[in-house]
């Protein structure tokens, strides 16, 4: 448990330190963290706790680097390659149905994956559920 707290703290601290220079201190009480959802936002940063119980769609973000830190559970994530069946869902946001030529990686508790902007990624298999921090760093 101590390792989880330390890793979580380091991950959050690193992200917040890389936020805008005039950022204010953000305190998130344990009760809020336990509920999941949005923990902190800044002009070039967002931190959330996500939960998945099933596979999602392929995602590509033109200006967002995603860092996932797995809190509990497991999943298979596919990264890289080429998105299939892509549609624009918003400025710089794209979703698709499959990835051709990507690399599959099993994620489990304690794992971290950093997905640079522009790289397709997809939770292809979620056997039961997965809880994870999402730190998004948004390029200007």
Show the residue positions of the predicted features:
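Short, surface-exposed beta-strand-loop junctions and turns on beta-sheet-rich folds
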Residues: 83-85, 129-130
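Short, conserved beta-strand element in jelly-roll/cupin
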Residues: 62-63, 67-83, 89-98
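A short, N-terminal "cap"/entry segment at the start of jelly-roll beta-barrel domains
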Residues: 4-6, 13-63
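Conserved metal-binding segment of the jelly-roll/cupin
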Residues: 107-125
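Short hydrophobic/aromatic-rich beta-strand segments that constitute the beta-sheet cores
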Residues: 49, 77-79, 132
């Amino acid at each position: 448990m101590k390792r989880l707290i330390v890793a979580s703290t380091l991950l959050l601290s690193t992200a917040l330190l890389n936020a805008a220079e005039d950022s204010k201190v953000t305190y998130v009480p344990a009760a809020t963290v336990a509920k999941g959802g949005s923990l902190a936002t800044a002009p070039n940063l967002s931190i959330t706790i996500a939960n998945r119980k099933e596979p999602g769609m392929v995602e590509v973000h033109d200006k967002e680097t995603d860092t996932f830190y797995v809190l509990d559970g497991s999943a298979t994530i596919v990264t890289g390659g080429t998105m299939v069946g892509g549609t624009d869902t918003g400025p710089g946001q794209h979703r698709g149905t499959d990835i051709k030529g990507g690399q599959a990686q099993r994620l489990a508790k304690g794992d971290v994956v950093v997905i640079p902007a522009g790289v397709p990624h997809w939770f292809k298999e979620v056997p039961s559920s997965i809880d994870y921090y999402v730190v998004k760093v948004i390029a200007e």
